[in-house]
Amino acid sequence: MPLPSKEELKEAIVKAVQYSPKRNFKQSVELIVVLKDVDPRSPEGRIRETIFLPKGLGKDKIICVVADGEMAEKARAGGAHRVITRDELLALSKKDAKKVAQECDWVLVRTDLMANAGRILGPALGPRGKIPVPVPPAADIVSVMNRYKSAILLRNKDQPQLMTRIGTEDMNPEDLVINAQTILSRLETKLPNGAHNIAKIVVKTTMGPPIEVMG
């Protein structure tokens, strides 16, 4: 199917929010893309893309940082949910590693600590669809943190569909459209036959009914 227009996306998003039953929490707005003629178990059919959403997610992702020294200090000052030093990393038990994986949406790791982070945190992060992100020692960690607060990991695991948040129900529909277009445009470039590999696009809130986007 061709990628939907801005108007088609907006119509579906407005309906998804409108038809969603009210809850006592802020619901996410989700984008679901069903694929066709793609084998998710093959290298060319496997999608794993980090995408930075230009209009944010309505609720920041929780960022944890593995670093020492100045980078650790800046990360703390910049509002990291948790900062783990090298010594603390090496002392983490499997239970502690699972707690980090549960608490943190993104784990940013100074590059010289990546090997240890992969060995210690990797087994806990992997099953949750999360990955440690390498950060060069000279990078501005606060800027990197701020970028990842609005980042999503788009992946299809072993199923021919992808599902991700594009924001929250209280966001401007125009902003949700821009986020959805950003994701769909990137996805189109990663599929073997582009938009021809897309069978269906659906939007919904956390607890609401699915609304199919007409393309």
Swiss-Prot record:
SUPFAM superfamilies in UniProt:
Ribosomal protein L1
- One Pfam entry name: Ribosomal_L1
Question: What is one GO cellular-component annotation here?
Answer: large ribosomal subunit
A GO molecular function assigned to this protein is: tRNA binding
| Entry keyword set | Repressor, Ribonucleoprotein, Ribosomal protein, RNA-binding, rRNA-binding, Translation regulation, tRNA-binding
Superkingdom in the source lineage: Archaea
Q: Name one GO biological process term.
A: translation
Concerning NCBIfam families, the annotation shows: PRK04203.1
HAMAP family with a match to the protein in the record = Ribosomal_uL1_A
The role this protein plays is:
Binds directly to 23S rRNA. Probably involved in E site tRNA release. Protein L1 is also a translational repressor protein, it controls the translation of its operon by binding to its mRNA.
State the family named in the UniProt similarity comment for this chain. Answer: Belongs to the universal ribosomal protein uL1 family.
Q: How does it assemble?
A: Part of the 50S ribosomal subunit.
Q: What name is this protein filed under?
A: Large ribosomal subunit protein uL1
